[in-house]
Amino acid sequence: MGEQKTTASSVNRAKTYQLVLFPLNNGATNVYYVLVLSYIATFGSKVLALSMLFASVMVTGMRLFDAVTDPIIGALMDRTNGRFGKFRPFMVIGNLIMAASILVLYCLTPIIPASAMGLRYAAFVALYAVWVIGYTFQTSCTRSGQTVLTNDPKQRPLFTIFNTVGSLLGMGAMQFFAPILAKNYEGGYASAGFFRTLAPVGIVISILLTLLAVIGIWEKDQPKYFGIGGEKTEKIKVREYIQIIKNNDPMQRLMVAGAGCKLALSIATNTTVLCMLYGCMMGNYDGLYLPMMVLGYVFSVPFFLLTVRTSQKEGQKASLMKYVSVALVCYVGVLVLLLLWGRGDAFTLSILGENGLSINLYTILFIVFFGIGYGAYYATADMPIPMVADCSDYETYRSGKYIPGIMGTLFSLVDKLVSSLSATVVGIAVSFVGLQSPVSYTHLRAHETSA
């Protein structure tokens, strides 16, 4: 009888609606991931007329600022155990901070006269810094909150699917609406009107997703689910982070894997990269961007099912390694096809021409390699997130301390620092081909017209 009680109480299972709704928190923050990291350099240089070098470096610089805020907020979360739980306050407050800062940044700072350029620089930096704090508040909950949601090894792999669905609702919605909205403004992505419209759209989507995520974790966000000794709060000093990393080998390996996945995603979905690929190279941004984006999502569906099945049978580590390998092989194939590319000949992407369907062998091969590669990669991109909960459980087992905030922000710290390099990598690559600024929608339209 005693054994049965212990066994039953040791497994914390989530209800279906909780597994579905809580991961929408990641979708809510991914709205801002696209809204800020994909466009803020263009906004700073084209709308506010700031130095392009300054605007680009700020993307990396603010990620370094995240290095300071992450451990502080993680420690603060682990000390929080109030009336509204441990995670819900950070989710709501973080989202409101981001909404306010982005609304002011994108809608009000362009009003500052060009003669007060110093004020523009100061406002840009200050509002960007405030946004970073809000972003850290909310993103840390996605990783940390899983520890209270479920510890069932059969359920945790399912988090990847629902997390990706949430990401699609957030990131996918922004990637879908952005080019549509850009067409309505002269200057496209470089116009102030584009940002004034896109910001409120993103904020509304993010708030709705956050509210649903709060509902998902509401029942679980209480002390009885806070691991061993959940009634007490852990007071871990920031300097103890080093010892935690040093003694938690699984967390070390997960940081490397997760950071690599995020860096690859950030580069692959960068607006400049997509504009150069579909617009400058293939000469048909409007006809290729959305179809290829949808194609990648369609190919990812079977891989989601495969990764979950493999995770439940062989473990999440084995699943991650297997399907990332598939993605790597396919992306090598994409690279070879791009090296063979030639404008105006058979080695170029072509889906719809002037006379209707115009698919060639090059396009078929590109679709196969890109589709399978993107599908396999996208299905594994969020797998490190539920694995953070496993590392947190291991830390509780190893040291007896329930510190999900610290574990989540440790992972997030490395994840953000590495992914922030994407803007730098793209910027360096662009400079090598002789461009002085990111490719905008206007630039590629002019390029297509003259081609």
Label every PLM stretch briefly:
Residues 2-445, 450-451:
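Membrane-embedded alpha-helical bundles of multi-pass transporters/translocases
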